[in-house]
A protein has these predicted regions:
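Short alpha-helical patches at coil-to-helix transitions and adjacent helical residues
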Residues: 86-90, 209-213, 419
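Detector for small/aliphatic-rich hydrophobic stretches
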Residues: 5-177, 428
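Extracytoplasmic/secreted cell-surface and envelope-processing proteins
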Residues: 102-108, 289-292, 331-333, 383, ...
Length: 431
């Protein structure tokens, strides 16, 4: 049995609810995003009886997201710059999983690394409410956009919208996809821009044909270096990319101490941000003529993770000269679908997709991802968004000193060391 969305609205209007919002962070709380009259927010009308979670470990979330990150890395082109947030993609897919059943749900959870769904959702919810410092923080926001002319499951509020709000702080909007598509596009773009601090101002130019629902995750990270670079020590120098040599702005630090490792093939360094245990880890070949792509790509997922983790127990040494390029990288992946299907998420795209907690006869049409990073003397700003389009189906200390000169291709991750979770991962082949 299905009811029109107006029935949900009527039911929702009789409920007193909690406000849905993005993660609270100092000086940057997205909260409810302003929309115009063409969009109706249902968030406050969805009642959540929140149960306090007693989470002391984020092991399942960390293991799942980090494994997903390694799979993404291997699936993306090896000869290009890449930058993405597995945390963002996993968050969006996890919200989709709330509405899934049967084989569709099993495939999503296998790909995400979910072994205990209740624990996974509790870890997600707890991480979303994490307190951050003024200088280093992560903002996460989720939203559900529903076409007002679509018939939804009679129990969509109980089965999907309420847990999406409870576990993922999901904001819920009803909009006229068919009658006012341009205004819907404007509101969606405004929501993403607001929740990425304007780093990603636009994700849509039009609503893809047949779309009845959009699930969107937005992540914004800002971190100030614990040991900042200074502009007077930034000067132009060569970066020897895979395809060309280019002259770029290189930042320098001299005689500072950092955690450093070298296994004979790959060397790495940890660059901490101020407070909250978030760090950037950078990896390069040890040999001057080494190739980070060849060395890193030959490692299994487990070996990649061990390499990243090895910096946690490495020595803190004096780095005689640290040289890091000042750079901006922006990546857009319009269509993660083949990658996700290769990870085992197949039925979600087919006529046999089971999202019956949302509606019968709907399937995923596309999953898209955009990410941007800015690295400068003060620190790092990074943002990412993941959007899932749902359509109707045919159915419906050391004495030794070291140098770390980043003047050739490198791999880097932004990691929350309090959980061990990789928030962003990237590779720079050329600048």
């Amino acid at each position: 049995m299905k009811k029109r969305m107006t029935a949900l609205l009527l039911s929702a209007c009789m409920c007193a609810g909690l406000a849905g919002c993005g993660t609270n962070t100092p000086g940057n709380n997205p909260g409810h995003t302003k929309t115009d009259s063409s969009v109706t927010s249902l968030t406050d009308n969805i009642t959540v009886t929140s149960v306090k979670t007693d989470i002391t470990s984020f092991d399942q979330l960390k293991n799942g997201i980090n494994e997903f990150s390694m799979n993404m890395y291997s699936a993306l082109p090896a000869d290009e710059n890449i930058f993405y947030s597995s945390y963002s993609i996993s968050s969006a897919l996890s919200m989709l999983d709330v509405g899934a059943n049967g084989a569709t749900k099993k495939e999503l959870e296998n790909a995400l690394g979910i072994t205990d769904l209740d624990e996974w959702n509790a870890e997600m919810k707890t991480y979303l409410s994490k307190d951050w410092s003024q200088n280093t923080f992560v903002n996460t926001a989720n939203s559900v956009w529903m076409n007002k002319d679509t018939s939804w499951s009679a129990d969509i509020e109980k089965d999907f919208l309420t847990p999406a709000k409870d576990y993922y702080s999901g904001e819920v909007y009803e909009a006229d996809f068919n009658g006012q598509p341009d205004k819907v596009v404007q509101n969606v773009n405004n929501w993403v821009s607001t929740n990425t601090n304007k780093m990603i101002p636009e994700i849509l130019k039009e609503i893809p044909g047949g779309t009845v629902m959009m699930l969107i995750n937005a992540v914004y990270f800002e971190g100030k270096w614990d040991t900042p670079f200074t502009e007077d020590k930034t000067f132009q120098s060569s970066f020897y990319g895979t395809d060309k040599e280019s002259v770029v702005d290189m930042m320098h630090l001299y005689g500072e101490h950092f955690t450093y490792m070298d296994n004979g093939e790959i060397k790495g360094i940890t660059l901490p941000y101020d407070g909250d245990n978030v760090v950037m880890k950078v990896f390069m070949p040890t040999a001057d003529d080494g190739d980070i792509n060849e060395l890193f790509d030959k490692l299994s997922n487990e070996e990649k993770q061990k390499l990243i983790d090895s910096l946690d127990n490495a020595n803190n040494v004096e780095i005689d000269t640290l040289q890091l390029p000042k750079f901006t990288d922006e990546q857009s992946i319009d269509g993660l679908d083949e990658i996700l299907q290769n990870m085992g998420i197949r039925s979600a795209y087919s006529d046999s997709a089971d999202f019956s907690k949302i509606a019968d006869g709907i399937a995923v049409s596309s999953v898209n991802h955009r990410a941007k990073v800015i690295v400068d003397e003060n620190g790092t700003k990074a943002a990412a968004e993941t959007d899932i389009m749902v359509k109707e189906t045919a159915m419906m200390p050391s004495e030794e000193t070291y140098n770390f000169i980043v003047d050739k291709p490198f791999v880097y991750v932004i990691e929350d060391q309090s959980t061990g979770m990789i928030l962003f991962m990237g590779r720079v082949n050329s600048l």
